[in-house]
Amino acid sequence: MELDRPFLQLPFLFDTEVLTAEVDRLVPENWLAHPSGLSGNTAVPLVSINGEPRDGFDGPMAATAVLRRSPYLLQVVSSFGEVVARSRLMRLAPGAEVQEHVDFNYHWYSRVRIHVPIVTEPTVRFFCGAEEVHMAAGEAWLFDSWRRHRVVNGSAKDRIHLVVDIAGSARFWGMVRRVQRADTVEAPQRLAFDESRESELLVERFPAAPVMAPGEMAAIVSELMSDCSANPNNNAKELEYYHDLLFDLVHDWRNHWSLYGFMEDGVSGYQALLKRTQAGLRPDPRVLVTQSNSVGINPIINQRLLAAALKSRRSKEFVTGSS
């Protein structure tokens, strides 16, 4: 999700001694390799699909066994008072780097990631847009994942962050606005470990509709085309071509939605519209490039739109609340 600045420190402070003690109790088998095979990058799922130790976004979230037996981690994740999406402990090995990239898949269209550093050093640097920061242990940070960003662990030990993905309620975004507009840094709310506290963890049950709503599809397409149109280096004819290709999808999707909604009878028609659009993409993935972050249009279309628009296997669960 886009923010109005690269980084934003939230007014929270957590006890890293207790967090570190819980992390130290983990066993090597808890740490999973990065799904893309990134060297030096491992993670422990804390909130995941059905609470299973795996990656993935598309399914009902639940606390994993690791989170359930880590009371302070559970208190920290719950303390934001928000509905939580996929969340993890992320470990970056000494000298390792997360290469520059942009988070543009559908998950990030409406979500932000809260970082809570647990084990870190001043030589761990987070770069986002034109800025860089060191996120100190126990703090809480947001960053704009639509900007190009990277992380460098320049220290001699593992860097471990708790990361919590949320869409955020009005209360949360009101807090963000208050912090952004403040002339002085707000005193942080300290959350000490409380053995007696019962944590209520709210998790996403429906991270995406089985069929993307026409209004959401129109918003994604409009924002993407506006971003590409703002780039003076893009070809006008190609802008026109992609405008027509994508808005043809929006209009026909809305028509089909009006007839079928989430009904099984409509799936083949939705699939045909997605296939038609996929076939219409130019071979060059960077035939058009966004002005905001210099990403090619095709990967964004594929990840944010085509791969996310139809999850028909979850239709019954979405309507009835059970699979």
Where are the language model's segments positioned?
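Extended amphipathic alpha-helical scaffold segments
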Residues: G215-S268, A272-K275, A279
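Charged, amphipathic alpha-helical linkers/stalks
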Residues: V163-N235
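Short beta-strand His + acidic residue motifs that chelate non-heme Fe in jelly-roll/DSBH
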Residues: E100-H101, V124-F126, F143-D144, R148-S155
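A short hydrophobic beta-strand segment most commonly corresponding to one strand
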Residues: R111-P117, A140, A156-G174
